A protein has these predicted regions:
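Active-site-adjacent structural elements that line small-molecule/cofactor binding pockets in enzymes
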Residues: 1-218
């Protein structure tokens, strides 16, 4: 319901004094149809229609000082272009600095590009790979991610076996300095903001990796 989202985002923006950023995503057919039991329509057309309705929906309560910005979960060139045309930018997930560079070219210089980067703060390769593969497992079967990775040059075998090259390209691990280097690569490629997702060594995402967040904080 775009109207409900519009009202909620305006309320949150007003309550947070402009710190709220709305993120919208079309999700994945196996999750939408399998888990939520609703039809998965054409992604581009569905998101375009949603954003158009969202922008024209009324909001009559106390207005925020400025309209909340909206970014779209985008991987492929068409969704990235839509993010530029109908939203304030994009929020790519499970990508590389190479993808960030490609996304910036499509979005243009003035749009938000808030990329996500998974990190494992450890210099032990076995620990890092084990944690990365645990995080990857649920995503590797989803077509949208597989297609995105293949566009970046990874093979089916890279994805299915979680090859060293695949893990090293998608997950920043090592010392603080090594992880910061990857973050800097995204920024040089055009990222407006790099969102850190810290992968726990034991795979337990219920407990935040505060040590990692503190170490990488600006």
């Amino acid at each position: 319901l775009p109207g409900v989202t519009r009202q909620a985002s305006a309320t949150l923006a007003e309550q947070s004094n402009g710190r709220f950023l709305l993120g919208l995503g079309i999700s994945h057919a196996p999750l939408v149809e399998g888990l939520r039991q609703i039809p998965y329509e054409k992604p581009i057309a569905t998101m375009r229609s949603y954003l158009k309705t969202f922008k024209t929906s009324p909001y009559t309560s106390i207005p925020p000082n400025q309209e909340p910005q909206c970014v779209v979960a985008a991987l492929g060139p068409q969704m990235l272009q839509l993010s530029s045309d109908y939203a304030d930018g994009a929020h790519p997930y499970w990508t590389t600095p190479e993808h960030t560079n490609q996304a910036r070219e499509i979005l243009g210089k003035d749009k938000l590009l808030c990329v996500e980067q998974k990190v494992v703060l450890t210099e032990d390769k076995q620990t890092a790979y084990s944690a990365a593969k645990s995080a990857l497992r649920i995503y590797a079967s989803l077509p949208n991610y597989r297609n995105s990775w293949k566009r970046l040059g990874f093979s089916e075998n890279d994805i299915d076996t979680a090859s060293d090259h695949f893990i090293d390209s998608l997950v920043a691990w090592g010392s603080i300095q090594q992880i910061e280097k990857r973050i800097n690569e995204h920024e040089k490629a055009g990222a407006s903001h790099v969102c850190i997702q810290a992968i726990p060594h034991d795979g337990n995402f219920k407990i935040p990796e505060w040590e990692t967040f503190e170490a990488l904080a600006p």
